[in-house]
C-alpha cells in the first residue's frame, strides 16, 4: 500500500480503480536556428490556433458551469494576446535565434516569475500558473502534441501529474469518481473549475502518476487529505465506513441552511463569507452566507496592462451587490503594493514589502487610482447593501485622509447627479498600532474587521513568508488574543460591531472564545459556513 498526503480541493471520499493519464512531454531545448522568419510565423500560427481553442473552451465552460467561470479562458486568451508576451517571444527568436518552442517557454517563464514570487497572496501567486498554461498550450500546438483523456464507461479515479483548466472542463463528472494530481494548489483556475463541477479532488500529493498504478484500486480521502494506492483490507473497510459517514454528514450540513447561527444559550454571531470574485459570491449564497464580510478587490487589478477603468470595477461591485441583496457586501479597497507587482503599478522594489508601501499607503501615493475605485464602489452601493473596508491602517491621520477623499468622491458624483447609496465605513485592524488606538479609531467609523493573518505577523515580528519562522506564526498566542479582545472592547464602547476575517475566524478551537469576548461576526471561506454554523449551534 502506498499513502500520500495532499490538499483537498473539493471534499469527498472516493473508492475505485485508477486511470493514469500521462501527457507527452514537449521537447524544450535552447537550440539555435537560422530560419528565423519560419520560426516566427510558426509561433504566430500556433498562437492563432490557441486563440481558437480558448474561444471554444470558453463556450463549453459557459454551458457546463457559468459565464463568470468561463472567463478563465478569456483571461488565458488575454495573456496570450499580451503585447509583452509576444514581444518577449519575438526577442527570443529574432535577437537570440532560439527555436519557437524554446522562445515561447522562455517568455512564459519570465512573465510567470513575476507572479511566482508573490507568496503572501495565493491568488496572485497562482497567476504564474496561468502564464505557464498559456505558454504550454502554444508549445504543444507547435509540436503537434494532442493528448486526450479517454475515460471508460465505468467511473474511475483519474491520477495524473497535473491538469489544466481545459482538461478539467472536458471531464465528464459522471465518469470521474475523483482526480488526484502530483502538483497543483487550492487557488488555481483548475481548482476553481473543479469545485464548480463538484468533482472530488486531491492535489499536490508529490507522488508521480506512474503507469504501473493503472488499474489498481485506490482510495481518495479528500476530507482527511490522503491518497491510498492498493489499500489493505482493513483500511479499505474503514474508508468505506468513512465514506458513508461523510455522505450522511453532508446531508446533515444541508439542514443548516436557513437556520440561525446561535449557541444553545441563545448567543448569536454573524457568519459571512470571504470572496475574491463575482463567482465566489454565488458560492457564498449557495452556502447560506449571511453576507460578504470581505470582498478582496485585487482580482480586478491583475493580469492586465493598466488599472481597471471605473466602469469595469462598477460592473463587478454591482454584480456582487445584486447577487447578495439584501445581504451586505463589505468591499476591501485595494490591498496591493511593492510585493504584488504589475508593470503598470510603477512601484519601486522594496527590501521588505510587508513593511512597505502597500494597501492604504499605496493608495495615498496614487490618489487618482484610489478615487476611481471609490467612485465605482459608491455607484454600486445604489444596487445593494455595501460597506467599504480600508486596510493596513496605523494612524488617525490616515483615516482623516480617507474621509477627505470620500467627500471629494461624493461631491463629484452628486454634481454629475449619479445615484449612490450610503455605504458604511470600516477599518481593518491588522496592525498592533491600529489595535492599540482602536478606542480612537472606533469614534471615526461604523465597524471594524480584524485581519488576524497580518496582525499575527506584525505582532510576533515573524515574516509569514519565512518558512523557518512557521512555528512562530501562532494566532493562538496570548498577545494576539489580547489585542483582539482589546479591539472588541474598544469597539463596543463606541457601539460599533467587530468582525474577524483572518484564517482563525474558521478555527473551531477559538469559536467559543470569540463568542465569549463578544465578537459580532466571523467571515470565513464559503465552504466553511455550514460546518461552523453547526459547530456554533452545539456550543453553550
Q: Positions of the model-derived regions?
A:
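Generic secondary-structure signature for well-ordered alpha-helical cores
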Residues: 48-66, 78-85, 91-98, 109, ...
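Short, charged N-terminal helix-start/capping segments
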Residues: 80-129, 195-219, 295, 303-322, ...
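N-terminal-biased segments
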Residues: 114-152, 219-243, 441-473
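Acidic, glycine-rich flexible loop/linker segments
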Residues: 1-28, 143, 150-155, 159-287
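An amphipathic alpha-helix/helix-turn recognition signal
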Residues: 45, 106, 186-189, 279, ...
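Conserved, well-structured core domains of diverse proteins
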Residues: 1-143
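Conserved alpha/beta-domain cores
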Residues: 249-540
